[in-house]
């Protein structure tokens, strides 16, 4: 019997709670099938290795090849899915420390959003666009291809948007930019502030 070192995270919302921004069907495929496959693969790959007892962040920082790809995708998706809350929630605008940092480093929230969306729209192929903080708390927007994550560069990931086609094709078809613009409606800025403060 396979030992489970990693398991699928529990979502803090119902599968239909992010509609109409992200449909229940997309959640069922993206979370229930894609992410579950990465978890299953990683459990098989790390069995009997030094990685089986490491936290995901360490595996991503130290591994290569298939272990890195699957661990990276789990870490990326965990951060992605846990940053959302239903459209009806009242926490979808940044405030506090993260808003101060956004204004300091990008000039305004609108300027930050424009740069973030531009980086997400222009990333060639599959990957992620990230807002991260460096060791001094400065904010950085980066494009990361495939399973890459800013932790490999010594940064603290705060917010991400998935630009792999499986993240948006059911709901938006080839309209990646529309998908990115819509996601702001479900970002839980309380969670982003918590990550920034860690």
Language-model segments: what does each one mean?
Residues 2-198:
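Feature for soluble, non-membrane regions of globular proteins
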